[in-house]
Amino acid sequence: MSNQLYVLAEQLEQAIRTSSDFQQLKQAYEAVRRDETAYRLFTNFRNLQMRLHEKQMTGAEILPEEIEQAQKAMALTQQNEKLAQLMTLEQRMSMVLSDIQQITMKPLEELYRSFAE
């Protein structure tokens, strides 16, 4: 039975890879990669985002200057048409994956709910 779940998971992976949402996201990443300015903004923003996330996860204080820096980086990122498109497509793909996760977790949620009743 569990082997069947892995087979289905691999099929889901392939379905995600071939979906129009993923293909559009992939094309948007490639467009950013080819644009030196957009790519530089993108990598700077991602690096800053990762540093702040790491601080948050370790409980380190995030300074007001860092928050301001992140807000400025976000504003610059959103002003770039390619990056704005990329972020929109990332958000759409993230929502699809979140919906899929909710669907796959439904049996456990129902089990836990029935146990609590």
From Swiss-Prot:
Pfam families: Com_YlbF
Gene3D superfamilies: YheA/YmcA-like
Database matches in HAMAP family: UPF0342
Family classification: Belongs to the UPF0342 family.
InterPro entries: Com_YlbF, YheA/YmcA-like_dom_sf
Protein name: UPF0342 protein GWCH70_0629
